[in-house]
Structures are given as structure tokens and as C-alpha cells.
Design a protein with these regions (language model features):
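N-terminal intrinsically disordered, low-complexity, charge/repeat-rich segments that act as generic
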Residues: 40-108
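Short, charged beta-turn/beta-strand-edge "cap" motif at the junction between a beta-strand
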Residues: 25-27, 165-171, 204-205
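Solvent-exposed loop and beta-edge segments used for protein-protein assembly and interaction
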Residues: 13-17, 27-31, 90-96, 106, ...
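Short solvent-exposed strand/turn elements
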Residues: 180-204, 222-233
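Feature for long, exposed domains in two main contexts
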Residues: 1-55
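A structural signal for short, hydrophobic beta-strand segments that form beta-sheets
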Residues: 1-3, 60-63, 133-140, 172-175, ...
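Oligomerization/assembly interface segments of phage tail-like spikes and tubes
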Residues: 73, 87-106, 209-240
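Autoprocessing Asn-cyclization modules and mimics
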Residues: 103, 107-191, 234-239
Length: 240
């Protein structure tokens, strides 16, 4: 928070001063904070600050090509002189990555080029495309829960989810609770969503390397992407 001068700041009656609040690109993906202005008469004025500090990858894979999800555990194996073996896990959760191809035409091609130019090295909100569900009923703006059975899907409390219509029409929401075939949200939805809207769990992830864009025509391009999760992805010891 930048103020025009040194604190404490004197204000005359009806005087206007501009305070500049800057949010950096580095830090937790979800911004949830309060700035409090304290006045000499004991009054306080609170400013709610919320939002997201990341972009979403909103273009689905090219489903004519395989999508590969990889889980990588790390275990230390020690063999004693007597021949006994001791295995010690070195990771609480496996490293998780996804690799898939995309095919983009016209508007989608422009979106891919701009998104990669602007955000390649930073953290993305990556949908887990294979766990997609569709809304069975309209979702009003300001909704605080989504009716969906999340059993066996990658929705997690504290993680993000995406409501999706197309590459430019989507909304990221934060999951607060999962129970009784409903997902409770930490903040209300900002717009209404019709029946058939896709709902996907998201994980924060980074591109492992800069993709090489292949142009097939002046409108059509393709590339291969590999993302690695930046958040812990707890995994059950057995398949659900």
C-alpha cells in the first residue's frame, strides 16, 4: 500500500488522497486479505482484497492424442548386511504431471500465443480434464455451492475448480467443503452458468519447459505441453 507522503497522513475536511494498492505476481494463488485504515479518532475502515494471482489454462487437449498423467514417488531403500530391507518414503505425496497435445484454430490460436507469451514461466490453474462433470441445472450468479457428486474425482478442499463454456468464458472458484453431493465455495460465483456448463477440478501447475509451436497453416497450430503440479496432491493407498 503506497501513500502520498509519510505516515501518519493528515487529511483536511473533504480532502481527497489517492492510496495505491499493489499486488505482486509472486505468492499464494488465492488472495484473501484485508487492509485496515486507522484514523486518529479511533475509527477503522476495512478494505476487502480478494482475487487470484494466476492465469488458467482453459484450452482442452486434443483428444485424438493421448493425455498422460504421471505419479512419481521417491523411496529410500537400505539393505542391511543381514539382508533385511528397509524402505523409507521421502515424499508425503507423489510428484504429479500431465502431458497432452493441443490443436488451436483462429481465436484459440491467438489465445494460446498470448497466454504463453505472457505467463509461460509462472503458475497456472490447470484443469484436470479427465474429471469433467456437467451442470445438470442452471447455476445462478452469487451461488455459494454447486450440486455435483465429487466422489472419486480430484476436487479437494482448498483447491480451485473451473466453470467452463469455452476458452475465453470460464470462472475459477475455490473449494471450501465437499459433502452430500455438493461442493461449497469459499466465495460466491460472479456470473450465472447454464445447464451443460463443464465443471472441472484444478491444480496449480507449471510448464516444465517452453513449448514449441508448430504452425500447420496461418490459422492452425499445435504443440505438446507438459505441466507439473506445484501443490501437494494427496493420493490414496488404494484405488477408489
Amino acid at each position: 500500500l503506497t501513500v502520498p507522503g509519510a505516515l501518519p497522513l493528515a487529511l483536511r475536511p473533504l480532502q481527497e488522497r489517492v492510496l495505491t494498492l499493489t499486488v505482486g505476481l509472486d505468492g499464494p494463488p488465492v488472495i484473501d486479505a484485508v487492509a485496515v485504515l486507522s484514523f486518529a479518532d479511533g475509527a477503522n475502515w476495512s478494505i476487502r482484497i480478494d482475487g487470484l494471482r494466476l492465469n488458467a489454462w482453459s484450452l482442452p487437449p486434443d483428444w485424438s492424442e493421448p493425455l498422460t498423467e504421471t505419479l512419481a514417488w521417491l523411496t529410500d531403500v537400505q539393505i542391511a548386511v543381514a539382508g533385511t530391507v528397509t524402505r523409507t518414503p521421502l515424499r508425503e505425496a507423489p510428484h504429479r504431471s500431465w502431458e497432452f497435445a493441443i490443436l488451436a484454430d483462429r481465436r484459440e490460436r491467438r489465445w494460446v500465443e498470448h497466454a504463453l507469451f505472457d505467463w509461460t514461466a509462472r503458475v497456472w490453474a490447470l484443469p484436470v480434464f479427465v474429471d469433467t462433470r456437467r451442470l445438470g441445472a442452471p447455476l445462478a450468479a452469487g451461488a455459494v455451492e454447486i450440486p455435483v457428486d465429487a466422489t472419486g474425482l480430484d476436487f479437494a478442499v482448498g483447491s480451485l475448480a473451473m466453470l467452463w463454456r469455452d476458452v475465453a468464458t470460464y470462472e475459477l472458484v475455490e473449494v471450501a467443503q465437499i459433502a452430500n453431493a455438493r461442493i461449497a465455495l469459499r466465495a460466491p460465483t460472479r456470473r450465472a452458468w447454464p445447464v451443460g456448463t463443464r465443471l472441472m477440478p484444478c491444480r496449480t501447475a507449471r510448464l516444465t519447459d517452453a513449448p514449441e509451436l508448430r504452425r500447420h497453416t496461418d490459422r492452425l497450430m499445435s504443440t505438446q505441453l507438459r505441466f507439473e503440479a506445484t501443490e501437494p496432491c494427496d493420493w490414496p493407498p488404494a484405488l477408489p
